[in-house]
Amino acid sequence: MNKLLRKVRKAFSLKADNKAETGIGTLIVFIAMVLVAAVAATVLVHTAGTLQQKATSTGSQTTQQVSTGIQVNSIYGLDSNKSVPTHGVIEWLAIQISITAGSSPINLANVTISLTYHGVSASLTYVGLENIGNATVTNDVYGFNSAVGGTNNVFNSSYFKTINGASNGSKHFAILVLSDPTNSMTAQYPVISYEDQVDLLVNVSAVFGGITEGQAVSGEVQAPVGSPGVIQFTAPESFVSDVIQLQ
C-alpha cells in the first residue's frame, strides 16, 4: 500500500512545475530589469543632451561677457570762461571711447555713464530722439552727430544742442562719431564696432553744476554685458586753457 502511495505521489509531483514557474518568474524579472535600464538610459541621454546645450549656451554667454568691453581712451573738458581767472569750472566733457579687441559690437543706446563728484552720483543714458517742435511744427532731433570727416573742435555747441538744457543735460549724453570705417553707426542704432571711435558728450554743468579745479571724478561707461570703461581723474589745480585733458 505504501509503495502504491509513493508511486502516485511521484506521478503527480509538482517539483517540475515549480521549476518551470521559477524559470518564468526569473525571465519576467530579467525583462523588467532590461526595460527599467532602457528607460533609465533614455532619461540619462536626454538629460546629458539638455545639460550639454545649457553648457554650450552658458559658455557662449560667458565668452561674450569676458571678451566684450568698453575702453576709455581719453577725456577732455571745456572751461568756456577762461577769460575770468577765478572761473575755473569745466562745463562740458568729451569722453572718447572704443571697444576692446575681440569685443562684440555694442549698442550705445543701451550704455550707461555713471559719474560721482563731491559725493553726488549721476547716471546718464543716450539722449536719443528729442522732439523740439510746437503744436504746428515738429522737428525731431537726435543727440547724434558725425565728425568722421574731421573736426577741430569737439566742443562745438551744435554737438551739445540736445543736452544743452538742464532737463536733458542732467540725465543724458550725446554722441559724436569720430571714426566709423564701416559707416554703420546711425542715430537710431548707434552700434559701435571694433575700430570705431566715439566721443560721449556730457553736460557736467547741468549734472553737477560743473567740475572745479583740483576736484576728483570717478565713474564708468557700462554696457549691459562686458567690462566697463573706467573714468578716474582729478582736475588740474589751475586751468590754463579752455580745453583741458583730464584723463
From Swiss-Prot:
Keywords: Archaeal flagellum, Glycoprotein. One of its GO terms (biological process) is archaeal or bacterial-type flagellum-dependent cell motility. Residues 1-20 form a propeptide. It holds the Pfam family Arch_flagellin. GO terms for molecular function: structural molecule activity. PANTHER family: FLAGELLIN B1. Belongs to the archaeal flagellin family. Flagellar filament preparations contain one major band with molecular weight of 41 kDa and several minor higher molecular weight bands; this is the protein sequence of the major band. Flagellin is the subunit protein which polymerizes to form the filaments of archaeal flagella. This is Flagellin B1. It comes from Thermoplasma volcanium (strain ATCC 51530 / DSM 4299 / JCM 9571 / NBRC 15438 / GSS1).
